[in-house]
A protein has these predicted regions:
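Right-handed parallel beta-helix/beta-solenoid
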Residues: 66-68
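Left-handed beta-helix
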Residues: 47, 53, 58-59, 64, ...
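Conserved catalytic-core motifs of eukaryotic protein kinase domains, centered on the activation segment
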Residues: 89-90, 116, 150-151
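A short, polar/charged loop-to-alpha-helix boundary motif
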Residues: 70, 92
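C-terminal segments of enzyme domains that contribute to small-molecule binding surfaces
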Residues: 94-107, 111-112, 143-192
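A transmembrane-helix-recognition feature enriched in membrane-embedded lipid enzymes
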Residues: 1-53
């Protein structure tokens, strides 16, 4: 969904100070040279993007410098190398937010255009051009991106934590089931 204003109107109305916008023009091109992904995430957050701290963004992925505050990236999202998140169009300069749902994966070289929402657990193929919303639990690929199929993977398998491990192991609980390292360590501490 594109906003009804163009980029120039948005620049005048945005809630960010002009000094911060100027600093961000210097910082954003340098983020790709930061070797630590958590620091890169913090820098993107400082520039205005709404990124969950568990999201991983590759070095060469780029967020739009014009309006990074319109980008929202959910928990556990993986954004591969060369991905471009563009919040404004060049033809008529309309702006639009980009929302990427939790546990989604964006393949290398994909381009996400303004006004796109990517659902939870979605997978975007490499070099895809996403110009429409992507529903949850699907795979998309191509130019323009089209739905290939459902991911078909139970959500519990994608995001295993100590909290949901016990319920997942449930009925097939045996000595052969390997526990996550944190769960095994916690069990050792309890027995001591």
């Amino acid at each position: 969904m594109l906003l009804p204003i163009n980029l120039f109107e948005y620049r005048r109305q945005r809630p960010v100070s002009r000094t911060r916008v100027r600093l961000r023009k210097v910082v954003m091109p340098c983020i790709q040279f930061v070797p630590v992904w958590r620091l890169r995430t913090r820098l993107w957050q400082w520039c205005g993007a709404n990124i969950d701290s568990t999201a991983w963004i590759a070095r060469t992925a780029m967020l739009d410098e014009e309006a990074p505050e319109l980008v929202t990236i959910g928990e556990g999202v993986r954004i591969s190398y060369g991905v471009m998140l563009i919040t404004h169009s060049d033809l008529n300069k309309e702006v639009g937010p980009i929302h990427i749902g939790p546990q989604s994966w964006i393949g290398a070289g994909a381009v996400i255009l303004p006004g796109v929402t990517i659902g939870a657990y979605a997978v975007v193929g490499a070099a895809a051009l996403v110009n429409k919303d992507v529903p949850a639990d699907v795979r998309v690929a191509g130019v323009p991106a089209k739905i290939i199929n459902n991911t078909g993977v139970p959500k519990e398998w994608i995001h295993i934590t100590d909290d949901n491990y016990e319920t997942m192991a449930g009925s097939r609980r045996s000595e052969d089931v390997e526990k996550p390292a944190a769960a095994a360590l916690h069990e050792q501490e309890r027995s001591v």
